[in-house]
């Protein structure tokens, strides 16, 4: 394994960590409706659990309401039940074959709780990035030990890995700030 392989690998893994963090943030409710909120809701479709997006069309009715249109009429009750049981604090209402999912306004206390959750998720993501840095530095040390690279090369590569770490940690901080602002906006 070369220095370039190590740097390339750690950057790809850091980018995947950022993507996973973005997905986690998308699941945190802000009071504003977005279809991504229901992405992880699973519906019982003839005995197997499938994502809601595979049995229904998700649309935004307005800023505070998601419209869910199941493709089969007999699925309306099952989709509504799945949304209700998804533990998102949502109360869907059915009108014919359209399920309306209004977003209840967040209380001040709930907003503060959510900002704490966002900060916690951010810290978890930063720890993942730092662990990747540690793994890369250990791989570099192994290359020096095996006499494949010089200590100067290791130091330069280590500096590059640190720059990648700083860049990704800053990106996480920015995402956390943006999400907190979104949550605290009434």
Swiss-Prot record:
GO function term, MF aspect, one: ribosomal large subunit binding
Record-given protein name: Ribosome-recycling factor
Role this protein plays: Responsible for the release of ribosomes from messenger RNA at the termination of protein biosynthesis. May increase the efficiency of translation by recycling ribosomes from one round of translation to another.
Main localization category: cytoplasm
Alphabetically ordered keywords of this record: Cytoplasm, Protein biosynthesis
Record-linked InterPro entries: Ribosome_recyc_fac (IPR002661), Ribosome_recyc_fac_dom (IPR023584), RRF_sf (IPR036191)
Keyword Ubl conjugation: no
UniProt similarity note: Belongs to the RRF family.
NCBIfam families: frr
Domain of life: Bacteria
CDD domains from the UniProt entry: RRF
Lineage: Bacteria, Pseudomonadati, Pseudomonadota, Betaproteobacteria, Burkholderiales
One Pfam family here: RRF
One Gene Ontology term, aspect cellular component: cytosol
The keyword Protein biosynthesis is annotated on this UniProt entry: yes
